[in-house]
C-alpha cells in the first residue's frame, strides 16, 4: 500500500462538476493498493499517517501531528501510484490491486483513519474521474509504502 501525503491549507475533490468532499488544514492523501496488501498494511499506514509530525509547533519546528492540530484528511484512491515504466514509455499498472481487493482496503483505511482522528475523513469516489484541488502548505510532501518501511 502506498500513499502520497501532502500537507495542505485546504483541498477538495470534485466529480461531475459537484464537490464531493472538501477539507481545511490537514492532509490530502493519494492512496494506492497493491494485490498483496492486507489489513495489516492498513493498520500500519493508519498509525503512521495519524502520528506523522509535520505541523509546526510554537517554535516553528515540525513537531505536531494531524491529531495534535485537530486537522482534517481527504483520501483519494490513486491506482497510478503503482505505475511501472520499466518497458517503453506507456506506463503499466499490473501491480495495482483489482477492484475486488482495492475497494475494501481503501474503505477500511478511510474508516480506521477516521477512527484514529476522531472525526470523519473526506473521500473521493473509487474509480471516478475526479478533479482534485489543493493548496500545498510548505510544500510538505511525504511518500510512504508499507513494503518499504524506512
Residue ranges, per PLM feature:
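Glycine-rich, phosphate-binding/catalytic loops in enzymes
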Residues: 93
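N-terminal, polar/charged subdomain of small-to-medium soluble alpha/beta proteins
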Residues: 1-89, 97, 104-150
Amino acid at each position: 500500500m502506498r500513499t502520497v501525503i501532502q500537507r495542505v491549507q485546504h483541498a477538495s475533490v470534485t466529480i461531475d462538476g459537484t464537490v464531493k468532499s472538501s477539507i481545511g488544514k490537514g492532509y490530502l492523501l493519494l492512496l494506492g493498493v497493491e494485490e498483496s496488501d492486507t489489513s495489516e498494511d492498513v493498520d500500519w499506514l493508519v498509525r503512521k499517517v495519524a502520528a506523522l509530525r509535520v505541523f509546526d509547533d510554537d517554535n516553528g519546528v515540525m513537531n505536531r501531528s494531524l491529531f495534535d492540530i485537530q486537522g482534517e484528511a481527504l483520501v483519494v484512491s490513486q491506482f497510478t501510484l503503482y505505475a511501472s515504466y520499466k518497458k517503453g514509455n506507456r506506463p503499466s499498472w499490473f501491480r495495482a490491486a483489482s477492484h475486488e481487493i482495492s475497494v475494501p482496503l481503501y474503505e477500511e483505511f478511510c474508516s480506521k483513519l477516521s477512527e484514529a482522528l476522531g472525526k470523519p475523513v473526506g473521500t473521493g469516489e473509487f474509480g471516478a474521474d475526479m478533479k482534485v484541488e489543493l493548496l500545498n502548505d510548505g510544500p510538505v510532501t511525504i511518500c510512504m509504502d508499507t513494503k518499504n518501511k524506512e
